[in-house]
Amino acid sequence: DAPLIIDEIVMKIDSFKKIFEILNETQRDIITIGEKEIVEFGTLYSLSAVNSIAPHYRDITDPDHLFGFVFDCHLTLQMRDKLLLFKSNLATPKRIFLTRKSTKKRHYNESEVWGVLKEYGFEVVAPETYTFCEQMALFNNADYIVGGSGAAFTNLLFCHSGCKVICFRSIRNYSPIFSTIANIV
């Protein structure tokens, strides 16, 4: 069997590493390649990307940027089902308000929103403080999720079909990434 060649960052980020370990069902050998490393191969097999979504759009005014997305719903759901087999048994809240533990300030009135949501039984959650398997459980068990747009919303993939979500985002940067994920679940 040919080994799998991956970017070394996959093995340095716990959630990426866990996803890779789960999906590497054949237990192929792994060769990691550094960011600026140049490698020559005799024969190289390349896998097509399941999804191709360009990250980190900033101040997009041209709607044509939306045409660069490729999203295979069927394969994404297959991957979701495999990954959910490894979700944590952690007891998690049904109503979650997503925040960031880092000191990076959100660009909306987060404290005022929290003031309203706590009256409705929401709990503040910083997804980056959970393991990948715990994040799957957190989102899969939630009935309501509210928060500012960010990477944590990729976990919408693991929500159950009845989950209700409010995602605050800038009106200047429209991207259908999270709504596309939510619609396939």
How should each PLM-predicted stretch be described?
Residues 1-185:
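The feature primarily captures lumenal catalytic ectodomains
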